[in-house]
Amino acid sequence: MEEMASRMISGDPELGEPFQENGLRPKYLKEFVGQKPLKANLTVFLHAAKQRAEAIDHILLHGPPGLGKTTMAQIIAWEMGVGLRSTSGPVIDKAGDLAALLTNLNPGDVLFVDEIHRLSPAVEEILYPAMEDFQLDLMIGEGPSARSVKIDLPRFTLVGATTRAGMLTSPLRDRFGILARMQFYEPDELQQIVTRSASIMGIDISADGAFEIARRSRGTPRIANRLLRRVRDFAQVAGPGYIDKDLADRALLALEVDRNGLDNMDHRLLKALLDKFAGGPVGLDTLAAAIGEERSTIEDVIEPYLILQGMLDRTPRGRKATHASYTAMGRTAPRPVQQGTLL
């Protein structure tokens, strides 16, 4: 879907965006904005591991895309003063690929595996003893001459990241000593992130301009930084050269991001739900066909934020509009029909 690829408020990274993000990532936990419960716990775990001169336990970071899982993995390595090796689940095709990564780690190093839920079963089998016993069990040769070889590994920390924790197998999930869910950010936290990013990028921005971008960023720092870069373009070419609330509002409306943080895809879904199905309930497949999108696109991309904002209900009979749905679309919600009594 071409529209999906260019969606301004998707939490997934765009082509080349990770390189732009690198300069904006904080290095230390104290610089990381938001995720206060996770930061508090990690501070304890990191200090305890350093006091014992041990590698910190394996960590699973899970949550929607764009919330800072990769950044957190880098911070963990930086705080521990160790090296970081990064890869992703789909890249590790064979057990040998994983073995090569593990045998090249130094004591205490962090191995970061993004999209860890996409590891193949064969690779997972190799990972189990590596995580638990810090050993590799490899088969050398084939047929009758094949033999098992155990290779000792340095104590390392595996940091896995996933947007779908439910797709992890139980044996893999159970081997993580620290499970951490990353939550969506509050607008004031995103305002701090936008202000910090603007300072690094040399952008002149007012407090209300930063908040205007923050409150439309769907609780996601990656989206906030992306919108900041695009609003900067409007300020540079069609504005006064700095970002205030008025310019941010005009630029974001031009980018089809409304004052609720909804874009064209969100509007299409809500419009179909209200106009074609009278607010629902309607089955997911029927709704997907009505807006020309795949079922998975609605479930994974469009729905989560609408549900978070109370603009969509999942019911046993299908998707249903809420009072907030009508308000967001500038409609008046119908009054609930009251059933009469028999008496």
Swiss-Prot record:
E.C. code: 3.6.4.-
Keywords: ATP-binding, Cytoplasm, DNA damage, DNA recombination, DNA repair, DNA-binding, Hydrolase, Nucleotide-binding
Binding site for ATP: L24, R25, G66, K69, T70, T71, E132, D133, F134, R175, Y185, R222
UniProt: DNA binding residues: R295, R314, R319
Residue ranges of the region described as Large ATPase domain (RuvB-L): 1-185
Molecular-function GO terms, alphabetical: ATP binding; ATP hydrolysis activity; four-way junction DNA binding; four-way junction helicase activity
Any single GO CC term annotated in Swiss-Prot or TrEMBL for this entry: Holliday junction resolvase complex
Family matches, as Gene3D superfamilies: 1.10.8.60, P-loop containing nucleotide triphosphate hydrolases (3.40.50.300), Winged helix-like DNA-binding domain superfamily/Winged helix DNA-binding domain (1.10.10.10)
Region (Small ATPAse domain (RuvB-S)): 186-256
GO BP, one annotated term: DNA repair
Binding site for Mg(2+): T70
InterPro entries referenced in this protein's UniProt entry, alphabetically: AAA+_ATPase, AAA_lid_4, DNA_helicase_Holl-junc_RuvB, P-loop_NTPase, RuvB-like_N, RuvB_C, WH-like_DNA-bd_sf, WH_DNA-bd_sf
Localization per record: Cytoplasm
Record has Cell membrane as a keyword: no
CDD domains: AAA (cd00009)
Residue ranges of the region described as Disordered: 1-20
Lineage: superkingdom: Bacteria
Region (Head domain (RuvB-H)): 259-343
Catalytic activity: ATP + H2O = ADP + phosphate + H(+)
PANTHER family reported in the protein's UniProt record: HOLLIDAY JUNCTION BRANCH MIGRATION COMPLEX SUBUNIT RUVB (PTHR42848:SF1), PTHR42848
Function: The RuvA-RuvB-RuvC complex processes Holliday junction (HJ) DNA during genetic recombination and DNA repair, while the RuvA-RuvB complex plays an important role in the rescue of blocked DNA replication forks via replication fork reversal (RFR). RuvA specifically binds to HJ cruciform DNA, conferring on it an open structure. The RuvB hexamer acts as an ATP-dependent pump, pulling dsDNA into and through the RuvAB complex. RuvB forms 2 homohexamers on either side of HJ DNA bound by 1 or 2 RuvA tetramers; 4 subunits per hexamer contact DNA at a time.
Similarity annotation: Belongs to the RuvB family.
Domain notes per entry: Has 3 domains, the large (RuvB-L) and small ATPase (RuvB-S) domains and the C-terminal head (RuvB-H) domain. The head domain binds DNA, while the ATPase domains jointly bind ATP, ADP or are empty depending on the state of the subunit in the translocation cycle. During a single DNA translocation step the structure of each domain remains the same, but their relative positions change.
Subunit structure: Homohexamer. Forms an RuvA(8)-RuvB(12)-Holliday junction (HJ) complex. HJ DNA is sandwiched between 2 RuvA tetramers; dsDNA enters through RuvA and exits via RuvB. An RuvB hexamer assembles on each DNA strand where it exits the tetramer. Each RuvB hexamer is contacted by two RuvA subunits (via domain III) on 2 adjacent RuvB subunits; this complex drives branch migration. In the full resolvosome a probable DNA-RuvA(4)-RuvB(12)-RuvC(2) complex forms which resolves the HJ.
Name of the molecule in the record: Holliday junction branch migration complex subunit RuvB
Gene name as annotated: ruvB
